[in-house]
Regions:
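N-terminal secretory/targeting leader peptides
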Residues: 1-184
Length: 184
């Protein structure tokens, strides 16, 4: 099981075939193994890899829970779902239609988040029945390990700095709000 980044040392972990994913896993101390999603089950079963980074869904839809008995939450990577629209299209809508569009976007986001949460809850129950143990971790040590990657990506792509700064600001505000809620 993985509780801290140190637990990853020497482990072979499947990642998506991208330089960023490989570097991230290397920074956490594991040996990154780029591999297609469909090969993971057999690779874990045969000991080619020790684990993989996937959502909970892989435990049941791909039956990874049959061969991988620990699932660690460290949030080293979070893939957001986005609703995207053409800016010219949006700006060309009459105010009443734009209001309807914005409301539909808000509602669809709420529905998607709720449906995802319900599906994950169901998947976790199924995975637990397969013998999978879910592990909550302190995410900060994992975050610290990958900070050099943030710096590398921003150095190579300076146009991303304002977007990165905006995301960090939003994240910090959310974390501050959570901290205040816990202290009340």
């Amino acid at each position: 099981p993985v509780y801290t980044p140190d637990d990853l040392k020497g482990m072979k972990i499947r990642v998506q075939a991208s330089p960023t994913n490989v570097r991230m896993m290397d920074l956490m101390g594991a040996a990154a193994v780029p591999m297609s999603y469909g090969e993971v089950y057999t690779a874990i079963q045969q000991g080619v890899i020790d684990g993989a980074e996937n959502s909970e869904m892989a435990l049941t839809t791909m039956k990874h829970g049959e061969v991988a008995k620990y699932y660690t939450y460290n949030q080293h990577q979070i893939v957001p779902d986005l609703l995207v629209a053409n800016l010219k299209f949006l700006e060309g809508l009459p105010p009443e239609e734009r209001k309807i569009f914005d409301e539909a976007a808000r509602i669809s986001t709420e529905v998607e988040v709720q449906a995802w949460d319900e599906q994950i809850e169901d998947v976790k129950k199924q995975a637990e029945e397969m013998g999978v143990v879910f592990i909550e971790t302190d995410m900060e040590p994992f975050r610290q390990k990958v900070l050099p990657l943030h710096e590398e990506v921003l150095k190579d792509n300076p146009r991303l700095v304002p977007i990165y700064d905006s995301i960090q600001s939003i994240q910090n505000a959310a974390l501050d709000g959570e901290e205040r809620s816990r202290n009340e």
